[in-house]
């Protein structure tokens, strides 16, 4: 008995050795493939793709190494895959990629892999269309998954996925992805892996008596996914992630509460959801953060599972945030594309020996595609075979006339010997049919097309023969691995005409022996044409010319002609060619004289072993710009300029460029700079009157108070606006005081200059001349806020004036009492252009106070009449009264733009207070004192 077992084991081992299949490089098989009793091993870096093999049965073990791949796929709508491994004594081990893909088929597919063990450490994909039930079973006794298992259907059917031997156990520490599939548990589940339900998928725990590890995880990713657990007395707790958005968790029987508990309960503290039917219950750890009001009892009626009415619970709300286990974070990848499932084209090369004993290399293009029914077919187009036998040259001992041409980018090896032995056309034509060319042409990749024209003319008194030989060279490289690219070498083209009545044409390549090509592109074709009259055996004159023409437009090679004549007889040998002519397109590359590589294509004519370039296509994409073409562009630029004062300024704008000519189109205005250079700017002060109303200030009555006169005044005012424009740098004014038509003070003339500083501020320098004495002073132009109050209402206005103090505020109040000004006399100011003295009037009126606005630069015309009235055509500026004969009081500040009194029709008594902000002539204390006086007078009256 032991001997018999040893014999069986030996036979089995020998069988495995004999029939083992080892894949060490990429391989594609289409159609029926017989695996026999073979162990299959696919090594790293290699793949085996089996396409449209309806039944694939693995009899031996299957071992896919790391970095290797096994692909079994269907490309036919009518052909579904049936893949099985039925040898119970063999194993399946995958460390690479295994893919079974039958998604395109409209019939039922089946995947049934059995064996003594199943181990997946890589990626395995099982895909079906799902139009019919397509079961998948991986039912090995020893079952382990640490990688990715993906079960995919285009749509869900009643087919299920079974893992492991029923009633056995599986160990899952990886990821099991379900897409429109149903996983039915029939074993114990060990490990800390993950089952992920995508799309319309269901995880069905059909036998709770077989324990599921508490570390195993179940992930519901879509609203259509669900989980169903058998309801038995044995209660387990399942880790569920992604519960929400309407997906379901349920039991195999309807949910029903009892006297103590409801049909379902959620513990917000522990995150446990309990589903029960009377006394049977199962628990699900869904996590915390759920709203108990959003749970609802529903029915899960998916295919492939027991349809239980009101046996599940759905949560109609967002899934609370919860960290996924690492195994659930392994992505569910899409089904990979199998090599060779799309139409393809490749080249092939065959080397053989012909009947003459010469080595012949054939090359062709293989097209693999499918017909309308999805069936694969292959077409092969072979190029003609060329001999690689070395060529020999004929050496003439007689005197010869030599002409040599050495092109730079052409490498052509051919040998043609034409001995001249006859002078008749008939003999010439008969000899032409026996021409042989012993050559091994080698074409450099640098020159795709070169043609050589050789003409021989036979002429006599009444007979003539024209023989034209044209042979061209072209390359049609499909892939670099199929062709040998020779290096350039020196080529000598020799035309030899011996004096001993023998003429020969030979083209010799010095690098032919060293090239040793394994494949030579068909490169020569000969076209002969002959015409003759009646032949006569008289002596003839032959003209032999050799022409090298470079037909590629990008080639810079010359066109050289070498011609010799001799009174000799012609004997020639010609090549034999096939009568079958074909045309096809091809692509080649050339190298120009400047080293650039150009790709060209065209139509090639093939007659036997002869190839001729008929047409060269124009480049599909080429842009040739003339070297001196003028292109006009516009762009933004920045530049620096040097002013006449040697200062450098930076400017920017739009520049137009035409060839090398630059033209400034637009100059942008300079941006405001943080640093403004200090300079003196001219200003012009204009005065415009907004009202045509005449301003009058009159002295209506007088009374003696001691030695003084008291005057009551009435004011009729109109507003004015000052416009300041940079036109004059100096403002000249003059003024004097008249009393009873006599000058009360010396004439005063002013010269005022305004300057703008780098910080944006303005300043004014004033020089006053009193009796030819200059009194210069410098002031700053500042802004003050004037607050005007009328009864209980107040308003503010901003005025600009000249002062040595940066800012000041004065408040004008109102009163119901009239005031009188006491003085020796009412003095006034006259002047041509008075702008150096101004006052702010504090008025009292029973109807309201005056309002301050902005004005400056008045030109009053003042005169005293018999009633001592003061008249003006513009408006009157009142100042502090001075005694007769006293000098003009010169204010310290020269207002440029200060308050103006808005016209009012009421009669009022006013006291004028010169408003000189920062002046040492009138202090704030004096203003307060006068305000108290005014208040006292108001109380007195």
Swiss-Prot record:
GO CC terms of this entry: cell surface; extracellular region; fungal-type cell wall; side of membrane
UniProt PTM comment: The GPI-anchor is attached to the protein in the endoplasmic reticulum and serves to target the protein to the cell surface. There, the glucosamine-inositol phospholipid moiety is cleaved off and the GPI-modified mannoprotein is covalently attached via its lipidless GPI glycan remnant to the 1,6-beta-glucan of the outer cell wall layer.
Topology of the protein relative to the lipid bilayer: Lipid-anchor; GPI-anchor
Record's signal peptide: 1-20
Subcellular location: Secreted, Cell wall; Membrane
Disulfide bonds: none
Keywords: Cell wall, Glycoprotein, GPI-anchor, Lipoprotein, Membrane, Secreted, Signal, Virulence
Lipidation (GPI-anchor amidated asparagine): 917
Lineage top rank: taxon: Eukaryota
Propeptide: 918-941
Upregulation: Induced in low iron conditions.
Family the UniProt entry places it in: Belongs to the HYR1/IFF family.
Protein task: GPI-anchored cell wall protein involved in cell wall organization, hyphal growth, as well as in host-fungal interaction and virulence.
Name assigned to this protein: Cell wall protein IFF9
Species in which this protein is naturally found: Candida albicans (strain SC5314 / ATCC MYA-2876)
Taxonomic classification: Eukaryota, Fungi, Dikarya, Ascomycota, Saccharomycotina
Gene name of this polypeptide: IFF9
């Amino acid at each position: 008995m032991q001997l018999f077992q040893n014999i069986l084991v030996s036979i089995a081992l020998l069988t495995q050795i004999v029939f083992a299949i080892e894949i060490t490089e990429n391989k594609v098989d289409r159609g029926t493939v017989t695996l026999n009793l073979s162990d299959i091993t696919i090594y790293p870096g290699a793949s085996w793709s089996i396409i449209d093999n309806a039944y694939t049965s693995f009899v031996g073990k299957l071992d896919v190494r790391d970095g290797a791949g096994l692909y079994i796929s269907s490309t036919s709508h009518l052909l579904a895959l049936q893949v099985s491994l039925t040898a119970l004594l063999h194993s399946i081990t995958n460390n690479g990629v295994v893919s079974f893909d039958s998604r395109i088929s409209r019939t039922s597919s089946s995947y049934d892999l059995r064996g003594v063990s199943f181990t997946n450490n890589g990626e395995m994909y099982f895909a079906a269309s799902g139009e019919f039930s397509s079961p998948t079973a991986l039912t090995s006794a020893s079952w382990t998954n640490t990688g990715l298992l993906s079960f995919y259907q285009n749509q869900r059917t009643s087919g299920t996925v079974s893992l492991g031997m029923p009633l056995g156990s599986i160990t899952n520490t990886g990821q099991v992805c379900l897409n429109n599939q149903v996983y039915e548990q029939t074993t114990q589940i060990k490990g800390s892996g993950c089952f992920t339900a995508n799309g319309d998928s269901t995880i069905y725990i059909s036998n709770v008596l077989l324990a599921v590890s508490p570390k195993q995880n179940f992930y519901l990713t879509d609203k259509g996914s669900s989980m169903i657990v058998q309801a038995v007395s044995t209660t387990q707790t399942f880790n569920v992630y992604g519960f929400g958005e309407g997906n379901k968790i349920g039991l195999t029987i309807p949910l029903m509460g009892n006297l103590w508990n409801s049909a379902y309960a959620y513990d917000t503290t522990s995150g446990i959801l309990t589903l029960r039917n009377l006394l049977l219950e199962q628990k699900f750890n869904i996590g915390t953060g759920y709203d108990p009001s959003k749970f609802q009892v529903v029915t899960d009626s998916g295919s492939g599972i027991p349809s239980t009415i009101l046996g599940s619970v759905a949560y109609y709300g967002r899934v609370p945030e919860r960290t996924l286990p690492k195994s659930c974070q392994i992505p569910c990848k899409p089904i990979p594309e199998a090599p060779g499932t799309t139409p393809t084209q490749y080249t092939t090369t065959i080397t053989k020996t012909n009947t003459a004993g010469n080595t012949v290399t054939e090359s062709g293009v293989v097209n693999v595609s499918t017909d309308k029914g999805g069936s694969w077919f292959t077409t092969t187009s072979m190029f003609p075979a060329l001999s690689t036998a070395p060529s020999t040259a004929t050496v003439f001992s007689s005197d010869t006339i030599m002409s040599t041409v050495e092109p730079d980018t052409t490498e052509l090896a051919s040998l043609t010997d034409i001995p001249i032995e006859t002078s008749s056309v008939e003999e010439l034509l008969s000899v032409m049919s026996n021409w042989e060319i012993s050559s091994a042409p080698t074409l450099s990749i640098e020159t795709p097309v070169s043609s050589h024209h050789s003409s021989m003319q036979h002429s006599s008194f009444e007979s003539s023969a024209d023989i034209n030989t044209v042979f061209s060279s072209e390359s049609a490289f499909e892939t670099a691995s199929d062709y040998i690219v020779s290096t350039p070498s020196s080529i000598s083209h020799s035309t030899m005409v011996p004096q001993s009545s023998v003429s020969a044409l030979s083209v010799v390549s010095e690098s032919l022996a060293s090239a040793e090509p394994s494949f030579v592109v068909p490169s020569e074709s000969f076209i002969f044409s002959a015409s003759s009259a009646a032949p006569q055996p008289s002596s003839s004159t032959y003209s032999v010319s050799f022409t090298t023409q470079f037909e590629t437009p990008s080639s810079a090679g010359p066109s050289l002609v070498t011609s010799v004549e001799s009174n000799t007889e012609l004997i020639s040998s010609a090549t034999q060619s096939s009568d079958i002519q074909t045309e096809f397109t091809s692509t080649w590359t050339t190298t120009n004289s400047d080293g650039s590589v150009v790709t060209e294509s065209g139509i090639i004519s093939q007659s036997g072993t002869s190839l001729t370039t008929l047409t060269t296509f124009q480049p599909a994409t080429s842009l040739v710009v003339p070297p001196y073409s003028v292109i006009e562009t516009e762009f933004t630029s920045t530049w620096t300029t040097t002013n006449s004062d040697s200062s450098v300024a930076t400017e920017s704008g739009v520049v137009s460029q035409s060839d090398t000519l630059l033209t400034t189109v637009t100059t942008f205005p300079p941006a405001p700079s943080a640093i403004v250079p200090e300079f003196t700017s001219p200003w012009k002060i204009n005065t415009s009157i907004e009202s045509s109303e005449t301003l009058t200030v009159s002295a209506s009555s007088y009374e003696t108070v001691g030695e003084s006169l008291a005057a009551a005044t009435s004011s009729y005012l109109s507003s004015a606006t000052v416009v300041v424009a940079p036109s004059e740098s100096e403002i000249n004014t003059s003024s004097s005081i008249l009393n009873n038509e006599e000058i009360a003070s010396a004439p005063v003339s002013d010269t005022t200059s305004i300057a703008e500083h780098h910080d944006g501020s303005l300043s004014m320098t004033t020089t006053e001349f009193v009796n030819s004495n200059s009194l210069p002073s410098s002031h700053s132009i500042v802004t003050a806020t004037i607050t005007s109050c009328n009864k209980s209402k107040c308003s503010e206005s901003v005025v600009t004036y000249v002062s040595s103090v940066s800012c000041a505020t004065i408040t004008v109040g109102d009163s119901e009492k009239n005031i009188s000004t006491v003085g020796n006399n009412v003095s006034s100011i006259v002047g041509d252009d008075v702008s150096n003295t101004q006052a702010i009037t504090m008025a009292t009126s029973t109807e309201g106070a005056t309002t301050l606005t902005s004005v400056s630069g008045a030109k009053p015309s003042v005169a005293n009449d018999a009633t001592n009235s003061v008249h003006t055509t513009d408006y009157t500026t009142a100042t502090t009264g001075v005694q007769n004969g006293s000098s003009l009081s010169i204010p310290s500040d020269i207002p440029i733009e200060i308050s103006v009194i808005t016209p009012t029709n009421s009669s009022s008594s006013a006291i004028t207070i010169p408003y000189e902000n920062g002046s040492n002539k009138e202090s704030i204390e004096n203003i307060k004192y006068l305000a108290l006086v005014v208040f006292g007078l108001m109380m007195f009256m």
